[in-house]
């Protein structure tokens, strides 16, 4: 097994499978978590896991970096889009993927959805979907 595969397994184990207060901590106060719909599905997690090995590792590494730097993370890794919605930006060769997120109280970062970028601009439908998920999250968590 190559070094790259070992790193992929490490990221998968530590970021995807281990969620909760027992997760390893960085010297930051930020913690990324996946938005869950009413039926328990997690669109951003499902998107990341559906990617090929290299893109999956890149996206999981970016989630790690996002937890370390939080709202200080800038381009080329993160970009603000609209009304408090941000995108994590991953590129490998000509393949470009994005994961949408927003900041919540007490350093929580909520990853909402992801997509493969095909056009120059981020599709408005993806931003609208992230806003819809944020609205649902806030309603169910009593902060709207």
Which role does the model predict for each range below?
Residues 112:
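Conserved catalytic cores of phosphodiester-cleaving nucleases, focusing on short active-site segments
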Residues 1-96, 105-109, 118-144:
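Basic, Lys/Arg-enriched alpha-helical interface segments
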Residues 115:
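Residue-level signal for short, function-critical loop segments
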